[in-house]
Amino acid sequence: MQTINLDKLDLCDGQTLLDLGCGHGRHTHAAYFHKRCRAVGLDLGFEDVKITRAGFDANPDLEPQTGTPRRYDLSVGDALALPFADDSFDRLICSEVLEHIPDYQGALAEIWRITKPGGRIGISVPHRWPEQICWLFSEDYHNTPGGHVRIFRAADLRADFEALGFAYRGKHLKHGLHSPYWWLRCAIGVNNDRNIFVRAYKKLLEIEILKNPLPLRLASALADPLMGKSVVMYFDKPQDGPLDGPLDGPDSTA
């Protein structure tokens, strides 16, 4: 399940990408196979990094190694003190991570530090009003160790990145079909995954993720701009010279 659009990230062969807070590696794996790049996955949790590695072991690159080789590296590390030199990465993904970090401003400063001039980043956090409903229905949803510590307003987070010097390129919403699932989970008990309705909805989402048939693609296309679970934003770290225009014309999402 990808949240960041790798085409909007404009990932190219030969580039180096960091998936910051990679979790089980969904974006690390996707970037690795999307282009002949070096995909680096980093997470605070060692077990998560082990699962990411297992994903590569289970799905090796079987294409002939001609031209620019693919490469991946995995690491355990803290978003507030990243183990990389300044200007290390052409592209960076930080998906559904910042809402977990009390000092998220420190993480933003590290993102600025390690992104190359001319680099592009893709950031996603929970969309404000669907997240507010989850918090309203359930204390357990966010009041757990390692859980969500804040609800972002997209305009404020954009301003935080722009204050560092990043240039905003655009945004979109994603995973609209997932919002009602989490509202349901929160309403009946976020840890009650045996409920018949929860199990049925989870199965539907698994079909969307694994097979994505046409009816679910159409439903997702309608739901994403209305109630996307995640808001995704793209920024460039400027270098000398004028910046290109927005990725998709005027920004029309709330």
What name fits each language-model region?
Residues T3-C134, D156, M233-F235:
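Conserved SAM-binding loop
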Residues Q2-K8, A154-L157, K211-S220:
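An amphipathic, basic-hydrophobic alpha-helix
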Residues P126-R150, R158-A159:
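Short, glycine-/aromatic-enriched active-site segment of Class I SAM-dependent methyltransferases
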Residues D160-F166:
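A structural motif corresponding to the C-terminal end of an alpha-helix
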